[in-house]
From Swiss-Prot:
Signal peptide: none annotated. The gene is aat. It comes from Salmonella schwarzengrund (strain CVM19633). This is Leucyl/phenylalanyl-tRNA--protein transferase. Transmembrane segments: none annotated. One of its GO terms (biological process) is protein catabolic process.
Length: 234
């Protein structure tokens, strides 16, 4: 296994099976963040992740963190909060503000560089990247964004400025995504937050098999049209 230097003149990637074991999943470096290359990456289970000042790094970790949306873990406290929630949730209303919120909400710094923001804005303009917004009155208090691959959604980042705002974004999105034919959410790398919401780890080979099948399955017509999302209260 060796780290591959990508060419700016080809958008091809090496097989994810050749990724390094340490650091886990590092596959390649270089290239660019053009829409064509980003889409090629997601179609093959690869994503960019690098710090400011570093070269572009491409990853495909093993195991892979995923969330089956119908298995979202709704804790008792979150259920009580949601039933009396002051929030309103929308889809694709404010992509620029969501990615900006994700980039600027971490005190310890962020991997979402200006180049990353611009690249995913282009993907959004092309209909491939999407945002979920959480509002309190007219204030954006949380949200998440990611890239669609048919019935699979590749979650990229989320942020929260008020209590349970990012959890609300994922909860409502999971319900709506499932109702319209969505099958799986890619969480990339497991962490305590996503694990508490139901994310699990599966072998990379299994993830790649799911991706190959699900990216061919379309969601219900016009699913990504900007609109308000609702979840029945129980």
């Amino acid at each position: 296994m060796r780290l591959v230097q990508l060419s700016r003149h080809s958008i091809a990637f090496p097989s994810p099976e050749g990724a390094l074991r340490e650091p886990n999943g590092l596959l390649a470096l270089g290239g660019d963040l053009s829409p064509a290359r980003l889409l090629m990456a997601y179609q093959h289970g690869i994503f960019p992740w690098f710090s400011p000042g570093d070269p572009i790094l491409w990853w495909s970790p093993d195991p892979r963190a995923v969330l089956w949306p119908e298995k979202f873990h709704l804790s008792r406290s979150m259920k009580r909060f949601h039933n009396a929630s002051p929030y309103r949730v929308t889809l694709n209303y404010a992509f620029d503000r969501v990615i900006d919120g994700c980039a600027n909400h971490r005190d310890e710094g962020t991997w979402i560089t200006r180049g990353i923001e611009e690249a995913y804005r282009r993907l959004h303009e092309l209909g491939h990247a999407h945002s979920i917004e959480v509002w309190r009155d007219q204030e954006l208090v949380g949200g998440m964004y990611g890239v669609s691959q048919g019935a699979l959604f590749c979650g990229e980042s989320m942020f929260s400025r008020q209590e349970n705002a990012s959890k609300t974004a994922l909860l409502v999105f999971c319900a709506e995504f499932t109702r319209h034919g969505g099958k799986l959410i890619d969480c990339q790398v497991i962490n305590s937050h996503t694990a508490s919401l139901g994310a699990i780890e599966i072998p990379r080979r299994d993830y790649l098999d799911h991706l190959a099948a699900l990216r061919q399955q379309p969601l219900a017509s016009r699913f990504w049209v900007p609109r308000t999302l609702f979840l029945p209260r129980k």
